[in-house]
Amino acid sequence: MKRDTKRVAVIYGGWSSERPVSLSSGQQMAAAARKAGYDVTEIDVTRELASQLAEAEPDVVLNGLHGPWGEDGCVQGLLEVMGLPYSHSGVLASALAMDKLKSKAVYRSAGLDVAADKRVTRAEAAAAHALPPPYVVKPVNEGSSFGVLIVREGANGPPHELTGPNWRYGDYLMAEEYIPGRELTVAVLGDRALAVTEITTLRDYYDFDAKYAAGGSRHVIPADLPAKVTEAAMDAALLAHRALGCRGATRSDFRYDEQKDRLVILETNTQPGMTPTSLVPEQAAHMGMSFEDLVAWMIEDASCQR
């Protein structure tokens, strides 16, 4: 089917805590898809998504959603039921990758190095140290570093935020060994890893503001690493992508502890940010692929039974 006759529904927005990020990704992808010659309909997702899609009658769905409902297998399941080819990973891979504990079980079975962890409730994590400090507390099913808390060495007690009135990230958490070192990320497109980017920030860690605020972080591509570490990170990202059963584009994040020469995988994002300056498009551009071409690749890669 020619591009100018292929109807593409770009879905974005939704109601998760990552809605602002999704709006940015989706609108940028829609603009790129139009520039590439596709017939594009933009859909700001509501709980009536099935009706929204039925009205749009797309040939392909380009998924620009982030966070719960959009990247945890829920929307993917709806698209499978409706028989609409869609981008990125399928139901099972999306659900596994979104659950930090389940994805780490997959990593372990694949032979990847992961940080020690423990599943805890919010009440348990608030009552006493879940692990010996330093450690990190993460919601099991959130993205964009929402709800991530670092407990430093010497901390007198667990994070006070867990008992505060503004906590909205659920009652099931993962306490994880804190891995010092350099923040690395690797994008995978289909069956190939693209490059290794090092992320530096003046903040305590790569949090929401570091990820999305102007000047919040600096991306070094390619990362200045020993060749063996670069190769190991790219191999590990591709292995994680395959072990989870992912399709399309993913981005895996790592910590590299130079003192111990230890490369630890943190997570795999099945719906990575998709603005022209996001990490995956940056790596694609580094490899000679424009943002427009990247979006077109995702559209042409779309399918059901992913």
From Swiss-Prot:
Primary enzyme class: ligase
ATP-grasp domain location: 104-300
Keyword ATP-binding in record: yes
Stored SUPFAM superfamilies: Glutathione synthetase ATP-binding domain-like (SSF56059), PreATP-grasp domain (SSF52440)
Cofactors, names only: Mg(2+); Mn(2+)
Pathway the protein contributes to: Cell wall biogenesis; peptidoglycan biosynthesis
GO molecular function: ATP binding; D-alanine-D-alanine ligase activity; metal ion binding
Predominant location: cytoplasm
UniProt: ATP binding residues: 131-185
Cofactor binding description: Binds 2 magnesium or manganese ions per subunit.
HAMAP family tied to this protein: Dala_Dala_lig
NCBIfam families to which the protein is assigned, alphabetical: D_ala_D_alaTIGR, PRK01372.1
The name this protein goes by in its record: D-alanine--D-alanine ligase
Gene: ddl
